[in-house]
UniProtKB/Swiss-Prot annotation:
Gene3D superfamilies membership: Ribosomal protein L31
Gene Ontology MF: a single term: structural constituent of ribosome
Keyword field: Ribonucleoprotein, Ribosomal protein
Protein name: Large ribosomal subunit protein bL31B
PANTHER family membership: 50S RIBOSOMAL PROTEIN L31, CHLOROPLASTIC, LARGE RIBOSOMAL SUBUNIT PROTEIN BL31C
Natural source organism: Corynebacterium glutamicum (strain ATCC 13032 / DSM 20300 / JCM 1318 / BCRC 11384 / CCUG 27702 / LMG 3730 / NBRC 12168 / NCIMB 10025 / NRRL B-2784 / 534)
Length: 88
């Protein structure tokens, strides 16, 4: 490998902002904030909005959108507007 062209790939702790869940992984991301991990070492801390701990797909709290009902509701509210034409 060539020197000085690759990003610094190091251990980082990611924390879910909503749940507080933390996990240690490797990344090129860096941060000024640090956290002491279970092994006693200090690692950079990256706070993220969504992780597998809080995302609806992974938590099972996923909702299915009723698109047919939404289209019918739209048609009821605005369907007649397209049919009406003003005569000049």
């Amino acid at each position: 490998m060539k020197k000085d062209i690759h990003p610094d790939y190091h251990a980082v702790v990611f924390q879910d902002a909503g749940t507080g869940f933390q996990f240690l992984t490797k990344s090129t991301a860096s941060s000024d904030r640090t956290v002491s991990w279970e092994d006693g070492n200090e690692y950079p801390l990256i706070v993220v909005d969504v992780t597998s701990e809080s995302h609806p797909f992974w938590t099972g709290a996923q909702r299915v959108m009723d698109t047919a009902g939404r289209v019918e509701k739209f048609e009821r509210r605005f369907g007649g507007m397209a049919r009406r034409k003003k005569k000049a």
